[in-house]
Regions:
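Short glycine-rich or small-residue beta-strand-to-loop segments that form or flank ligand, phosphate
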Residues: 1, 51-57, 135-138, 213-215
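N-terminal beta1-alpha1 ligand-phosphate binding loop
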Residues: 1-8
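Short beta->alpha linker loops
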Residues: 8, 29-32, 83, 104, ...
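N-terminal small/polar loop signature for handling phosphorylated ligands or for N-terminal nucleophile
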Residues: 8-79
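Short coil/turn connectors at secondary-structure junctions
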Residues: 20, 47-49, 110-112, 122-123, ...
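Proline/glycine-rich low-complexity loops and linkers
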Residues: 36, 64-161
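An accessory alpha-helical subdomain
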Residues: 133-234
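Conserved short beta-strand edge segments in small beta-sheet-based binding/regulatory domains
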Residues: 233-246
Length: 246
């Protein structure tokens, strides 16, 4: 929020979760301020979110506030997780006497939560269920976050209630955004669950890029719907006497 760090985690997570069948409803960027964090997490529960993912705030410095915020929301204390400590000792080749205060802080989780040692860093994935909402607190560095997601969360979203598959294909049309917009609306109406988006900022002087996203119960159905949407859009553009590139 002070312009020092660019958020790439939410962009990456949105891509992965959509592919695996999840539906993103909201992305928030919060200051390192515990009351603000607790309020945002509580509002997510009140809105009926089934899953909330946080990234960052699991390190050893005073501004790492995710664990104490979760503990406050849960109304519990915290403890040092032995499995995370043992993972630190094994991977670092150290004894318990050499386990530093900073490492202990990164091994600390709310009472009643579950920790999953990270395959790429020292802060674990922390899972907590609060009033029917599952919270996953992930480390902030992108390399660590992506490794934790691949190890622990891909299967969670793939097996989720109402899970589906989503596919995306980018095409290019020889039209202005205002010209092709009615055609995109026709495609989305004809192929339910389809989303079409033109990117005028990415276009050159002639061709406008358009992403077509479709969903299905499985990859085969998503591909079938994608083919339908692409074929229809190509036909509409062709009928207007314009070029269409897949």
């Amino acid at each position: 929020l002070i312009g020092q760090i660019q958020d790439s985690n939410s962009f990456w997570l949105s891509q992965q979760i959509t592919k695996l069948g999840g539906t993103m409803q909201r992305i928030s960027i919060l200051d390192d301020h515990q009351p603000s964090i607790v309020t945002a997490l509580r509002h997510a529960i009140e809105r009926g979110a089934k899953t909330v993912i946080t990234t960052g705030g699991l390190g050893p410095t005073p501004d790492d506030l995710t664990v104490p915020s979760l503990a406050e929301l849960m109304g519990v204390g915290t403890h040092i997780d032995d499995a995370v400590v043992q993972d630190h000792l094994r991977r670092r080749g150290i004894t318990i006497d050499e386990h530093t205060d900073n490492l202990k802080r990164m091994a600390t989780i709310p009472d009643g939560a579950t920790a999953y040692p990270s395959p790429a860093g020292w802060a674990p994935l922390v899972r907590a269920v609060i009033d029917g909402c599952t919270f996953f607190a992930m480390p902030g560095p992108p390399r660590e976050m992506e490794a934790v997601f691949a190890r622990f969360l891909e299967d969670y979203f793939s097996a989720g209630e109402g899970a589906h598959r989503a596919l995306t294909h980018r095409v290019y049309v020889d039209m202005w955004e205002s010209e092709v917009a009615p055609m995109l609306q026709q495609v989305m109406a004809a192929v339910p669950g389809t989303y079409c988006k033109g990117y005028i900022a990415l276009g050159n002087q002639r061709f406008l890029p358009i992403d077509v996203v479709t969903r299905g119960a499985d990859e085969a159905q998503a591909q079938s719907e994608l083919n339908r949407a692409l074929d229809m859009l190509e036909q509409l553009v062709g009928e207007a006497g314009r070029d269409f590139q897949r």
